[in-house]
Amino acid sequence: MELIFLLYVLVGFVAQLIDGALGMAYGVSSNTFLLSLGIPPAAASASVHMSEVVTTGISGFSHWKLGNVDWKLVRRLLIPGVIGGVIGAYLLTSIDGNIIKPYIAAYLLVMGGVILYKAFTLVPKKKMDEYHGPNVSWLGLAGGFCDAIGGGGWGPVV
């Protein structure tokens, strides 16, 4: 088995440990590691999202079975999130990787700060109605866009 393959497995393992501990940050952490290993931004984002299909699918299924899904909020976020993701993926594949890589690195650094802030700050519980405000669809659009370009960030953004 090649060393580089084992390194990629280690990246996924560490990213999933972080995600399991914080409830977010799989995409941000794994994309950061992949970019630091020299993977082009579009390939790194695609790799992260392919692996997230499994991890997020299992997580979503578990939340659904436990009754933790707010379907009204899902409906408000779904279509704008998909549109933002498609636009972000198109933009990411349309720009030379060497040009966009510094911007993605800066975005990932900011997202890392947001994740650390959310991990170590007590946030008062909000009423469910506060999550259904008029701007939640715009938040889904921005979250999908940022997640597609940066390889992660839906959790911290949304």
For the regions a language model picked out, list residue spans one by one.
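Helix-coil boundary and interhelical linker segments in multi-pass alpha-helical membrane proteins
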Residues: 1-6, 35-43, 47, 90-101
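Hydrophobic residues within alpha-helical transmembrane segments
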Residues: 10, 14, 50-57, 75, ...
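Selective transmembrane alpha-helices of multi-pass membrane proteins
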Residues: 81-89, 97-120
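Selected transmembrane alpha-helices and immediately adjacent juxtamembrane segments
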Residues: 1-40, 125-158
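Hydrophobic, membrane-facing alpha-helical anchors
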Residues: 1-5, 49-62, 109, 156
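Cytoplasmic-side transmembrane-helix entry/capping segments in multi-pass membrane proteins
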Residues: 71-80, 103-104, 128-136
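Selective hydrophobic functional segments
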Residues: 46-99
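Transmembrane helix exit motif
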Residues: 58-68, 105-131
